[in-house]
Amino acid sequence: MPSCRWTFTRSVPNRPNPTTRPSQFLASFRVLSNSNFAPFAPAVDMINLPYWCGENQRFVNLVTSDIWQKEVVSRVRAKGFKPLFFFCIDPRTAAKRKGLDDKPFKTPDDLKGIKFRVPGSKILQQFYRLLGANPTPVAWGETPTAIKQGVADALDPAVEALYAFGFKDILSGGTSN
């Protein structure tokens, strides 16, 4: 009888690329954020814009639409991946590292010169560059260290991530949508 082995991890530092193809006869499932998946399947990068879909139903409408299947899913499949579903964790929050200043982001001008942590998403890098920030690519697993060392000044995770990954101790307040 076939068996199934489940492995759950919070992060996978020092591990092979999480998007590598599985061995023959092995089903491999990965849960990746769209921003971390975008370098391997750039078509999904369009949904990385913070606050783009807003409400969950709008996101569901987008990723289940015929045009999404035609323009995005077909390109992801052409790269050798088969997405089971897309997910969006919102709202996002923009939070600064402790010691930078105590003021929350309120306007785009507040981002000028800020070293803003971004993943491998080209769209997010361009988004923050247009707002006047200095987008700083940092892998998710290295983000707490980068924030502590001042390599990055701010980031925009979902509120849940601030608590789940220990950021509440290294970031001052945040601004959420």
Where do the protein language model's features map onto the residues?
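N-terminal secretory/targeting leader peptides
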Residues: 1-59, 74, 82-177
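Hinge/lid segment of periplasmic solute-binding proteins
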Residues: 62-80
